[in-house]
């Protein structure tokens, strides 16, 4: 039987509809729509595409996008001053620093300048600490998108063995914390793990965020596992691929996220959701998507 398709595009569209309705109903009380500021430094082409996609998503749900594009030669102090300005802007509810930033800039120092309440990407150390403590706050977008995909497809992590490949602060570490909070038994493996396949074959839920095209094949996957592919890479011959060799894995997995169309759309949706939630809390409005 083919693996269940973990369709991020479909779920993202559903959540966008819910957010659009929540914004429309909250406007009379709030007096303005939610605002998301995306700070981009330099002219990295991939970052330009990502920012354009986020702006389109904002328009679909009724958020105002406050773009801030600075030259690659902009000094660190000037960028930090711009972030402090956005922190004080009453029309801005969420702020995202588009990563990566140009060489020579300290992205960690930039993230520290964010008002944690406006941290749309969930990467401020205070918000990561809240995640560790199980306290409410903005959540890292990609792991939160993975959890939403699992939940919406009836995959409950409770009591299951979950393995996360990758230990980055962007995906791997918060992913492990979210799965643990959902009562999974979690193992994190990485580039220095001996006999990787011995660990991954134990996983009932396998989240792959290794950043290596086609790293995971059928020999890494337990039959019946739910496999979430976070990776996305451009192939030399054109098109996109993930960290998972999907043609091999699809026949043996119970569920598999496609690339593209799986985790990627959910990352953008969770960015919007963090912003809409911050706006809702500011004006004492109901949570737009309880459970997500």
From Swiss-Prot:
**Matching InterPro entries:** Aminoacid_DH-like_N_sf, NAD(P)-bd_dom_sf, THF_DH/CycHdrlase, THF_DH/CycHdrlase_cat_dom, THF_DH/CycHdrlase_CS, THF_DH/CycHdrlase_NAD-bd_dom
- Which branch of life, at top level? Bacteria
What is the scientific name of the source organism? Answer: Synechococcus sp. (strain RCC307)
The record ties this protein, via Gene3D superfamilies, to:
Leucine Dehydrogenase, chain A, domain 1 (3.40.50.10860), NAD(P)-binding Rossmann-like Domain (3.40.50.720)
- Stated name of the protein: Bifunctional protein FolD
The pathway this protein participates in, as annotated, is: One-carbon metabolism; tetrahydrofolate interconversion
Functional note? Catalyzes the oxidation of 5,10-methylenetetrahydrofolate to 5,10-methenyltetrahydrofolate and then the hydrolysis of 5,10-methenyltetrahydrofolate to 10-formyltetrahydrofolate.
Per the UniProt record, the lineage of the source organism begins with: Bacteria, Bacillati, Cyanobacteriota, Cyanophyceae, Synechococcales
Keywords per UniProt: Amino-acid biosynthesis, Histidine biosynthesis, Hydrolase, Methionine biosynthesis, Multifunctional enzyme, NADP, One-carbon metabolism, Oxidoreductase, Purine biosynthesis
């Amino acid at each position: 039987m083919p693996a269940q398709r973990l369709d991020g595009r479909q779920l993202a569209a559903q959540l966008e509809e819910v957010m659009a309705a929540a914004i429309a109903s909250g406007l009379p009380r709030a007096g303005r729509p939610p605002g998301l500021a995306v700070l981009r430094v330099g002219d990295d082409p991939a970052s330009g595409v990502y920012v354009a996609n986020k702006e389109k998503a904002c328009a679909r749900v009724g958020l105002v996008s406050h773009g801030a594009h600075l030259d690659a030669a902009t000094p660190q102090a000037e960028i930090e001053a711009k972030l402090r300005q956005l922190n004080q802007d009453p029309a801005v509810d969420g702020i995202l620093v588009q990563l990566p930033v140009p060489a020579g800039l300290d992205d960690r120092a930039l993230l520290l300048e964010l008002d944690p309440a406006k941290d749309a990407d969930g990467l401020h150390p205070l918000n990561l600490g809240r995640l560790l403590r199980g306290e409410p706050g903005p959540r890292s977008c990609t792991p939160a998108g993975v959890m939403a995909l699992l939940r919406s497809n009836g995959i409950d992590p409770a009591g299951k063995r979950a393995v996360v490949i990758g230990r980055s602060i962007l995906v791997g570490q918060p992913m492990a914390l979210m799965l643990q909070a959902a009562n999974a038994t979690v193992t994190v493996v990485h580039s220095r793990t001996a006999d990787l396949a011995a660990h991954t074959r134990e996983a009932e839920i396998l989240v792959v965020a290794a950043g290596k095209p086609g790293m995971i094949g059928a020999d890494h996957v337990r039959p019946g596992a739910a496999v979430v592919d976070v990776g996305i890479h451009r192939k030399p011959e054109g098109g996109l691929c993930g960290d998972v060799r999907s043609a091999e894995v699809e026949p043996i997995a119970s569920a598999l996220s496609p690339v593209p169309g799986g985790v990627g759309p959910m990352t953008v949706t969770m960015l919007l959701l963090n912003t809409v939630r911050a706006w809702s809390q500011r004006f004492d409005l109901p949570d737009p998507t309880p459970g997500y």
